[in-house]
Structure formats: structure tokens, C-alpha cells
């Protein structure tokens, strides 16, 4: 993006970050001005095609849900799937063990081996195991990152998020999630016990629609006026076909497996 800006070449921004800064998207009551400035200038572009929980704007699509998850059976085995990479295992366990009646399945980036502390089962991060756990969970407790929260909502799981402090994107996601009815927890301190207890006790009904929109997004990108204009000017034409191939491969075959469409 910066290379394009410096060379005065039009750039199309694709991703979630552009949606976070869109005025049509719910915003937190108090924002970090410096964080917003960094996010706005990290990959500057006047043209954007982005993703969020709802199509808040004509240039915002709902999240692209990977086919692997779309094809998974959705059940309720009674456990709660937990993914909080910003917190250490001890900090997570200290809060979760206050609820011995709950089966907590924690995926940790800090642990290389699985172990159990009472009703809290800690295991290393593994994409397949995590998706299986989430698809069969009664609820999901996670950070306010976009992908995991969108996937939990797609699976129609009860959701609670703990946004990372100082991370403007997660703070904005949390504001959007709160507007949808998702419980937002400010920290994992034991004083938050009653909030967690209330979340465990009560049901949550958030019915969002995430259409299988990957092909539509690809078509929109490839027919975008900016790309047509660029093709006429011949500046980025050399990169057009490789870009298209990589984009389609990334969306329809994210794991790089042969034979998947």
C-alpha cells in the first residue's frame, strides 16, 4: 500500500481493517487516537473492499467462512471452547476454575503439551482440533479478533469476548459485537466472576447470516473499476493474472491441499 502511495498508483485495500475505520461501523465510546492513526496509516488506500459481521456499507461484505467449517456438523457437547492468546494459562485457569460445573476446553499458544487442572483442560493450538471443539461447543470464550468471533457467530454459538487492551481493531470489533448482543468482558480478573456467571447461566440468540460469498467477492475484485482503470493504464497489468490466481487459491484452498475446490 505504501509503495503504491509513494508511486501514486491506485491501490485496492482488501480485508477487515478497512471496515474497522468505516464510519458506518459501530465504534467504541472511547477510542485510542494514536491507535486509530496507526491503523489508518498502516496500509493507506482510498479504495477498499472489506469484511465485517454485517454489511454495514456497500463496500463491506460479511465474513468469508472457510469451507472446512461450513461442512462441519454443528452439535452441543456441553463444553465451552476458549481461545485467549493474549493471556497466560495461569491467568485463564484462575478465573475458569471458579466455575467447576463448566467443562472448559482451552487452546493455548503458551503450552506445547496438554494438561488438566480440575475442570479446565489446556491443549496446544491445533486448527483442526480447535474447529472441532468450537463446532461441538455450547459456547465460545475468546478474544475479539475477527475470524474466530465471526466463525463462532456463524456456528450460532453463545459468545463472550475479551478484547486485547491497546489493540484498536479488537476494541472496535468488541463495540460491534456488543451492539449485536455479545457479552464483552473487560478483563480476566476474578472480580469479573459475576459477569461470567451471568453469561454461563443465560442463553444468547444472535441470528446472523453468513452467505457463501467467496466467489462473489472474487468477481467483485476482478471487475472492480480500479483494476479496469489500471489495466488500461498498463501499470500493474503484469501482476494481474498472478494476483487473480493467488487470490482464488487462497480463498478456495486456504490449507494448500490438493483436490479441494
Stretches found by the model and what they are:
Residues 64-139, 189:
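Donor-nucleotide binding loops and adjacent catalytic segments primarily
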Residues 1, 13, 133-172:
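A donor-sugar binding/catalytic signature common to diverse glycosyltransferases
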Residues 2-6, 42, 52-60, 72-75, ...:
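Short loop/helix-cap segments at secondary-structure boundaries that form the rim of catalytic
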Residues 15, 19-89, 107-110:
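A nucleotide-sugar donor-handling region in carbohydrate enzymes
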Residues 29-30, 158-203:
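Nucleotide-sugar donor-binding patch of glycosyltransferase catalytic domains
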Residues 1-18:
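N-terminal glycine-rich phosphate/adenylate-binding segment common to multiple enzyme folds
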Residues 194-261:
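C-terminal amphipathic helix plus adjacent low-complexity
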